Amino acid sequence: MSDIAKMYETVAAINATAHGDVSVALISGLEFSRQLTSAPVLAAEFGAAASDMAIVFTGDDDALVPVALLGIKENENLYLNDDAKWTGRYVPAFLRRYPFIFARGEDDTMTLCIDEEYEGLRVDGRGERLFDSDGNRTQYLDTMLNFVTQYQRQHLVTQEFCKRLSALDLLEPASLSSTDEAGEVRRLVGFKVINRQKFKTI
């Protein structure tokens, strides 16, 4: 199951007819990320994210995706405590944009959507309204639209960055092993990392 499928349950295009009375209440925890073993990161985030978590590359050479490792076992997020509080210093933008996301239409246009199963959605007026009483986007929705738009732009930049890494043959297969308190050894395979020696020569 992909990272997006684990987070977004019921994605719907945002519009004033369906979401005219909907508000988004602030939820302090990140319970929606509980089952994520990794989270995609943008190239622009590498500096901030790398100081807090390991960044590796998954996927085929023509479709590489940089991700931050959050755990080793399936459905394990070690950065989330029992109270759903994030314990790391940096939260990837992939998580910060939730419950919003772009969906690509048949005509290749991008539509802003929301996960209607998000626990912070309200219809009682609490939280940030998506539309005002006249059916116009609120400043909050405009802010989130801008955030997701910038995310999408940086996603395209990241794709080109990964293609360049692959073309320069700077990536190499890697694995990770960890022993838990019970002495059980777990091994994570199927990803690549940057070959530092090759990287230093360019």
Model-derived features: positions:
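Short, basic/low-complexity N-terminal boundary segments at the transition from targeting/disordered tails
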Residues: 30-35, 73-84, 154-160
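Short, solvent-exposed secondary-structure boundary motifs
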Residues: 32, 36-39, 44-48, 84-94, ...
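Aromatic- and glycine-enriched beta-alpha-beta binding-site module
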Residues: 58, 65-131
